[in-house]
Amino acid sequence: MGRPDQTPSPRMNNNFNPVFHAQSEQPVDEKRVLQAEQIYPNNGGVVNQPNQVPMRPGPPTYINQSATFNQPYGVSMAGPVHTQPSNWTSGLFDCMNDGENALITCCFPFVTFGQIAEVIDEGATSCGTAGMLYGLICCLFAIPCVYTCTFRTKLRSKYGLPDAPAPDWITHCFCEYCALCQEYRELKNRGLDPSIGWIGNVQKQRMGQQQEMMAPPMGQRMMG
């Protein structure tokens, strides 16, 4: 028998091995190709970027220069703090500027004092309680000025009023009724009506704030 032919068959050659060719050819990564196209585009090196949509300008902002309301309803109605004393809006003997109050004070001074005390104390002291204490001190000691002068001091501290024409205790001791009338007018001239009580003044202030907020704005300017 002859020796078998040792010549390798073309199929046994690595150059023609289909398995070898299958292993040598690397799979194409589509993601890498896509990234390469984005980094190195074929349009002359210009990187394609998504079209930017221009932002639509927002509505203009209006600033009301007439008034600013930053306080909630029911705020304290305490008077402003004054660095320098201000003057009384009426004199001690200008009782006839409010004839009705002068008549009530002359006949029922405890009523006027109770109304004044309730507003000055911002409701902490009721009109009835202050009036009863006034009448009790007047009946027992006949010197209600020792009690009423303390509220005159509170009123002056609240609005920065001067101690005039005399110290508080002297003013109430010699001019009790005139002092009560002056204090009543002072509160009324500053926007606080003692006749409606503290709660009435708070409600009045709330109504005023609501009307101002509902009113059409004036003096506006538009911010670009």
UniProtKB/Swiss-Prot annotation:
Main function: May be involved in heavy metals transport.
NCBIfam families linked to this entry: A_thal_Cys_rich
Name of protein: Protein PLANT CADMIUM RESISTANCE 6
Biological source species: Arabidopsis thaliana (Mouse-ear cress)
The family this protein is said to belong to: Belongs to the cornifelin family.
Cell compartment(s), UniProt: Membrane
InterPro entries recorded: PLAC_motif_containing
Cellular compartments per GO CC: membrane
TM annotation in the entry: 131-151
Keywords, in A-Z order: Membrane, Transmembrane, Transmembrane helix
Membrane topology listed for this record: Single-pass membrane protein
PANTHER family in the record: DUF614 FAMILY PROTEIN-RELATED
